[in-house]
Amino acid sequence: MNNSNRSAWLIVITGLIVACLCFATAGAGLTYLALQAAAQSDVASRPSSLPSSGRTTSAPVVAPTVARTPVAGNSTINSTYQDLVNAVLPREDLADIAVRFKGVPASEAQFSCPTLSKGYEVGATRTFTLSNQDDNSQFVATARLEYKTPHAYMWVQTEPERVRLNLNRLRQAANDFENKIYPTTRAFFGEEESPGVDCDVHVHVLHVTGVGRTVGGYFSSVDGYPNEVRSDSNEGQMFIMHAERGYNGSDPGSESYMSTLAHEFQHMISFNQTHAPSLWLEEGAAQLAERLNGYAETVTSVYDFAANPDTQLNTWGEGTAGGNSAHYGGGYLFWSYLYDRFGEDIVRKLARSPERSPQAFIKVLADSGVTNSETAKPFTFEEIFSDFAVANYVGRQSIEAGSNRFNYATIDVPPMSTRNSLNNGDYPYNVREAVPQFGTHYYELKGSKPVSVTFAGSTVVPLLPAQNSDGAFWWSNRADQSNSRLTREIDLTRVNSATLNFRTWFRMEEDYDYAYVSVSEDGGVTWKTLETPDCTTDNPQNANLGCGYNGSSGGDTPQWIDQQVDITPYAGKKFLLRFETITDAGVNREGFAIDNISIPEINFTDTGNSDAGWKSEGWTRVENTLPQSWTVQAILTGSDGKITVQRMTMKDNTGTLPIDLGGNVRSAVLAVSPTTQVTTVPGAYDLQIR
């Protein structure tokens, strides 16, 4: 197998600081940050009567404005929204990028293995290039091969300092990986690339120090490429285990050590098996791998999600591992819910599908003949999420006989935090709130008299938090492992000088994801980045291909900024002009937007209102407005103790729901969730309970 159509991954798993029984944090970047086992929370599993959790979720995300702009069913924003939801972006391909931007011959960017290598024998030594996540630096370490199995090498650092491990436990851990984790994880998720770039079937497990205070271990897909593509590649399929005392790698055979191997091996398989543009699904799958290998007790991030159920499920934060713990928990719970509701075979199909995304899962269900019994139509992601939001509160209590639609069957879920707990003296209750998309606000309602719930939610939501957008503009879209391109031929054969003008708004993951303006004079075979007023040549992670846009336009809070680029060196020529974004697998931000493109000398102007001769690969012409959708549902505990679910019927995102408290209903839990994909701007709503 060659390494075409593959992207760069660096998956970091944070270490457990045992002394304080707490999660340390790790810097974001070209990273997957995965939390380790910690002391179990003192929050018990939800008992049978659905009592108050006794906790409330965090303060409002923003000072909200409830936008009530009418949205016609056939409006442009609805059709644009569907285009964005269904978009499949080109995959980041480091081999192709090396050919295009670095001039690497195509034959050297690929690899093949006509024969297997002889591999390494115990006692061999070699050097490795490693990353320190504390300061985003790289360093070189030397290691000795201490043990090997048919599919694993166990390397231990000898320089710059010697790592001392219990070699008997190391050998046993290697055998457990060989005999348990390796076959179990492959049976469910698929296979890693084997042999790899080194033409060796072994996975390299390297035990080192100096990779960062909060890093327990990581997998970097860069190591799967030839050095001609990435000079920092170790040219082998490998995991890094932080072996400093107190970290995962220092205690071979422990649950935290073995669960880390299971977690990272899933990432390695996924890199070969599927395109993973959604980090929350990728990390959820890695934690599912821990569970499938018998290490469910190490998945403690569910407690952080339970404390923050308003966490947006379908995104990831650019921050520390601790700050993203709730995202880990949400992703793991979603995979577990799918597993319990739809079964192992369907979830295995999702894990192995060519694209690991919400739309891919909907397709897996449809292809398997699974439909929504209420509509007799294929499921939507929003419908599944609505049921998931109920299951998170209900836990393992069965609501529908013979179905796990509203509950979990195989795991215990901590009680979800509530936004407020209300009783007789709290009514009438009025609140205006904002909640992240695909997050949930829970309100617990009790009382001796019936109440009426009135809801009014925003009908529209911004695509980007971009102020002063001038009508339509081009947007790169956003995803992990992506490479969106917008290309057009420019003819300057009749002019002696020329200037490229455009406005841009961008927010790209700091130091790892970049946007470029580039030109090709050979029909697109090779490309050169243009120097623009706000691009940077800084390259801390070997990811910048020249002069790229990174971070936020105009300061910490992105602003639209004007750009002017002298393209006189291309006067008298025809060439290809391209706007391009390249993102890694770790985190993605809102992306790259451009508007008011012009080259006055040839009377070219593009205000984003037409395709204007551009070839789009992943880019979409948009206006900065999306339709906002909502799910409002009540989990009712009847006077007989039976639990039912009732959904509010809404028109233009407004509706009323009567609840017979003090009569047929003993207590109720109101669950409010905005369900607009693509955006990370929260939805705002007004709630009245009288």
Regions from the language model: what does each represent?
Residues S4-A19:
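N-terminal Sec-pathway targeting helices
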Residues C20-F23, A38-T69:
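Ser/Thr-rich, Proline-interspersed low-complexity disordered segments
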Residues P64-E161:
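Acidic/polar low-complexity interaction segments
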Residues K148-A285, Y295-W316:
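Juxtacatalytic substrate-recognition/specificity segment
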Residues P226-N234, E255, S259, T274-R341, ...:
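Acidic/His/Gly-enriched intrinsically disordered linker/tail segments
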Residues S357-R485, R503, D511-S518, V587-F592, ...:
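Beta/coil-rich, acidic/histidine-enriched accessory regions frequently appended to metallopeptidases
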Residues A498-F506, F575-I582, G608, L670:
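Extracellular beta-strand-rich recognition modules
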Residues S518-K574, V622-T631, T637-T654:
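Exoplasmic/lumenal beta-rich domain surfaces
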